[in-house]
UniProtKB/Swiss-Prot annotation:
HAMAP family: RNApol_bact_RpoE
Listed GO CC annotations: DNA-directed RNA polymerase complex
GO biological process, one term: regulation of DNA-templated transcription
NCBIfam families to which the protein is assigned, alphabetical: RNAP_delt_lowGC (TIGR04567)
Gene designation per UniProt: rpoE
Family recorded in the similarity comment: Belongs to the RpoE family.
Domain (HTH HARE-type): residue spans on this chain: 6-75
Protein name: Probable DNA-directed RNA polymerase subunit delta
Native organism taxonomy: Bacteria, Bacillati, Mycoplasmatota, Mycoplasmoidales, Mycoplasmoidaceae
UniProt-listed InterPro entries: Asxl_HARE-HTH, RNAP_delta_N_dom_sf, RpoE
Gene Ontology MF terms in the entry: DNA-directed RNA polymerase activity
Plastid is among the record's keywords: no
PROSITE patterns linked to this entry: HTH_HARE
Length: 145
């Protein structure tokens, strides 16, 4: 069955306008109505539903409310739609919070990992290899006793 996906989406909008008006509806409900309207067979449903769902998600006429409910944007007040869109795309709060500007700060060099592992904190004159050699000598002297 060769149905144009645009026809499916545009018909879904017409169905939603007539049946649901300002009431929320589920995707399953609108899909069943589209199937009924176009007399889509059970065999053809699996090949059509995926693309229809993708187009449904991308269509700005359908607004997701959460809890698997949708609503037509035409029946929403601007404040209601704006609140939903702001909650989905929280850009204002993230970028306006006071973050410290680190771009011009001079970063102090940290103690090297090797120095930390070897126990060299810079206070003595022993190198890491001298410390290791001392540990090896201590372990051999303990074994020989």
């Amino acid at each position: 069955m060769q149905l144009e996906y645009l026809n499916l989406i545009s018909q879904a909008k017409v169905i939603a306008e007539k049946q649901f008006k300002a009431n929320p509806f589920s995707f399953e409900t609108i899909w069943k109505e589209v199937v009924k309207h176009f007399k889509i067979s059970k065999q053809d449903e699996p090949s059509l539903i995926g693309r229809f769902y993708q187009d449904f998600l991308e269509d700005p006429n359908f607004v997701y409310l959460g809890d698997r409910k949708w609503k037509l944007r035409d029946f929403m007040k601007f404040d209601e739609w704006n609140k939903i869109s702001q909650s989905m795309f929280v850009t204002k709060e993230i970028f306006e919070e006071g973050y410290e500007d680190l771009s011009n700060k001079k970063v102090e060099p940290e103690e090297g990992v090797g120095d930390f592992i070897m126990g060299n904190d810079g206070d003595d004159n022993e190198t890491g290899s001298e410390i290791v050699q001392g540990l090896i000598n201590d372990s051999f002297s303990e074994e020989n006793q």
